[in-house]
Every structure is written in C-alpha cells, then in structure tokens.
C-alpha cells in the first residue's frame, strides 16, 4: 500500500484537520515560507534532480523496495514540493495527509544527504513541513502531549518539581549502600559541570541516574544537578515544529547552568536532546554558539577513560555490536570516540554493516516513536532493513548511547524476534568499574 493510501487514525490529526480552513492553510503556509525560510526551499526544489539516489539511503525505502512512494524524493513531492507547487492552496484533507507522511515516514536521520549528489537537506525540508502542520494544529496526539508538557512543566513527562527532587534524593540514598559518602549535589555553584538528563530518566529509568552518580563519584568528578525547571534537556517541540517553545526550553536550560556558574554541561546518553541543545536551540535563539559549552556523555566518558579516571576490573566478554545514533554520529562526528570507549570496555566488538555515519537509523528518532501506538506498526514495517542488519552481526548485545535508539531498537528486536538486548555505555561502565568493598 502506498503511503498516500494508508490512513492512520489519530484524534489530533483529525481534530486539526476539521479546524483548518483553506484560507487559514494558505495564510500559515505563506507566513512560514516568506517569514522564516527565504529562498532555501525554492533552491532545493529546483536543484533536486529527482534521480532517486536518496532511495538507497532511506530505511523506509529499503524496507519497501517494491514501492517507490517510500523514497525520500517521493515523500518530498507529496509534501513540501506539493505545498510550493500549489502556492499553499491546499485543503484540510490534503494537509492531514501531508502531516501523516511528515510524522511517520521520515526520522530526519540525515542519512539521505550523504547520498544526494546536490546536497538537498531532506530532513530540513520535512521539519519545515512539521512546522507548518504545527501552526495549523495538525500534529499527532501523543507527541503533542509531550510538547504540552514542555510548555507547562519544562519537561516532556509531566514530572512535577517535587517528584524530580525526590527522584534524585531517592537514587542518592539507594547508592549510599554501595558507595558510602556518595552525593548527588543539587544546585552546587561553581562545579566543573552540570549533569543534565531527559525526563524519562526520573520517570522510567532512574537506575541511569544512580549509575551516572556512581561513575562520577568513582572518577572524583566535581559536578552538580539542577533542582529547578529547565533540568530536562529533551525537546519534543523541536520535532513538532513549535520552535517558540523550543527556544524557551533551551534558554531555561542554559540559564540554569549560568546561574550555577558551571564550566560546562555534560549531557546524558540522548541524541536528539544533544542536537537540540548544541544546534537547533542555539540557532533559533540567534546565538553564535552555546553560552555554556556542551559535551555529550560519549565524549565525557572518553575523556574520563583517557585521563585514567575510570578503572575497570575486567572487560565485557560477550560479543557486542555498536549502534550509531544519528544525532551524535552523523550530526556530531563522535564515531571514533564511541568506538574507543566501547573497545576499552568490551573484549569482542562486531561492527554492523554499514556503520559509523552510514549506519541505519533505529526508526525511533525525529519524534516518530513519540507519536505513540497508532504509528508503531508503520515504524516496524519501515525498518526491516535495521532488523536484518542487527541479525547479521550474530551477537546478542547492542551498545546504543541514546534513549530513543533504545526504544526503537527494543521494539525492532521484539517485533522481529531477534533475541538481542540493548545497553547504554553507562550500563557497561557501572557493571565493569572498580567499586568500593562495603
């Protein structure tokens, strides 16, 4: 079934469609294209040769080899290029179809740009489609709820301020049984770094906060975590196209670090949040660079290892493979440092084929996993190529330093019955490092 013929039931897409008049659609499109974009879209539309080279890059296209509607250029033709051709004169039903494609058939992983002979940035164009849809109120229900949470609480999981602090205190108390004297310092001024995480950690994965605190304690790090709203470094608004709220989130995050007078921000193992903090948020706020330096966990662990601050008792013996998160590898070039860290920790590393910047996306990124259950089957069908890639390694452990990648890979592993499991770098370091004898 071609992507235009498939209808995914989503209450917010339908509600937004019902409220979108032709006049409002045209006005919103023209306001965005003239006020925010300039000539960039027109240049891409005119330089794209419709050659189909991008089809070799897209996991959706490779997973549906007999259906040309899944190629990136076809998706552009059905969305942003259609918007430009029609000068924004589209009806509500057409916009609903465009919104569905933009939120289901592109993870904005940017693998395709490596294959395009003229460098058309398809991910940017699809994010522009989402921007238009967001201003029309045609955004999937589940991801819009996370954006609403950002607006109300400055985190994506509706975590209250007291719940956040309680989670940190709880993990500190738990860790003291294993690491006497350990602290999770709150609002410590002048520390070397502020450690920031995404909201799913206090909500679902509190053990990762425990592990990070243990690693920093054993490494002798001078660190802190903020207690006030702005602690969550994630950003679903970047994916919905609500750039105004994206800017507010990033400003709040950096202002916390500035108030604490830390030297830099160390971010947990999340890809999209890292990109939002070091790239998207800065540009939307018209900052030349981050007001406080930002380091991803991959790079920070690499530093600790090279400085001899992490000591392990043994290496992980079972064979592992490395998944390359799009936003830290294609987007930031941390492939070598990731491999240095994994090879330090693991005795037997089997590379995926392809790997590094050519690795396939997990199909969770770009906010697609956050669109929720209605979109899950499409996500699974659209990444058969990743399942094949994982299966071909012959291993049972996947090292993936990204939250969304864990969610996407775990879904793929279960759906295709691969018999594998995922690990964060922090999982491995905590498991293998020297610990005090209590």
Question: Language-model segments: what does each one mean?
Answer:
Residues 119, 200-290, 329-340, 350-438:
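Cofactor-cradling patches in redox/metallo enzymes
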Residues 16, 35-45, 78-283:
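Iron-sulfur-cluster electron-transfer modules
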Residues 57-83, 115-133, 367-381, 407-418:
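Iron-sulfur (Fe-S) cluster-binding segments and ferredoxin-like electron-carrier domains
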Residues 48-54, 58, 106-112, 116, ...:
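Short cysteine clusters
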Residues 134, 252-253, 283-285, 301-315:
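Extracytoplasmic substrate-binding proteins
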Residues 1-103:
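Ferredoxin-type iron-sulfur electron-transfer modules and their immediate structural context
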Residues 297, 305-344:
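C-terminal amphipathic alpha-helical segment
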């Amino acid at each position: 079934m071609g992507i235009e013929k498939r209808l995914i039931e989503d209450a917010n897409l339908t509600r937004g469609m019902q409220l979108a008049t032709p006049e409002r659609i045209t006005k919103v499109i023209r306001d965005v294209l003239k006020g925010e974009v300039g000539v960039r879209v027109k240049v891409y539309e005119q330089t794209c040769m419709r050659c189909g080279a991008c089809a070799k890059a897209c996991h959706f296209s490779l997973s549906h080899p007999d259906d040309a509607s899944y190629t990136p250029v076809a998706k552009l033709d059905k969305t942003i290029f259609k918007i430009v051709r029609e000068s924004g004169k589209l009806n509500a039903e057409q916009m609903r179809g465009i919104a569905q494609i933009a939120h289901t058939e592109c993870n904005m992983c940017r693998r395709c740009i490596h294959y395009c002979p003229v460098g058309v940035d398809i991910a940017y164009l699809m994010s522009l489609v989402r921007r238009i849809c967001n201003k029309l109120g045609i955004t999937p229900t589940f991801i819009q709820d996370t954006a609403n949470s950002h607006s109300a609480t400055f985190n994506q999981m509706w975590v209250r301020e007291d719940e956040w602090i309680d989670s940190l205190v709880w993990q500190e108390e738990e860790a003291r049984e294993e690491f006497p004297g350990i602290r999770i310092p709150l609002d410590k001024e002048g520390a070397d770094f502020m450690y920031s995480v995404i909201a799913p950690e206090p909500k679902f994965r509190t053990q990762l906060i425990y592990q990070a605190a243990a690693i920093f304690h054993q490494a002798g790090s001078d660190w802190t975590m903020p207690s006030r709203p702005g602690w969550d470094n994630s950003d679903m608004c970047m994916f919905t196209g609500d750039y105004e709220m994206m800017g507010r989130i990033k400003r709040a995050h950096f202002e916390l670090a500035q108030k604490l007078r830390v030297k830099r921000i160390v971010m947990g193992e999340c890809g999209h949040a890292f990109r939002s903090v070091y790239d998207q948020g800065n540009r939307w706020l018209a900052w030349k660079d981050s007001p406080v330096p930002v380091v991803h966990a991959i790079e920070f662990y690499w530093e600790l290892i090279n400085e001899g601050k992490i000591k392990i008792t043994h290496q992980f013996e079972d064979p592992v493979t490395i998944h390359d998160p799009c936003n830290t590898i294609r987007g930031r070039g941390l492939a070598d440092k990731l491999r240095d860290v994994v090879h330090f920790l693991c005795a037997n590393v089997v590379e995926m084929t392809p790997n590094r910047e050519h690795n396939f996306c997990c199909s969770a990124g770009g906010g697609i996993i956050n669109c929720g259950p209605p979109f899950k089957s499409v996500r699974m069908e659209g990444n058969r190529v990743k399942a094949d890639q994982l299966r071909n390694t012959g291993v049972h452990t996947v090292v993936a330093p990204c939250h969304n990648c864990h969610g996407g890979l775990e879904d793929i592993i279960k759906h295709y019955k691969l018999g594998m499991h995922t690990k964060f770098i922090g999982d491995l370091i905590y498991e293998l490092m020297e610990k005090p004898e209590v």
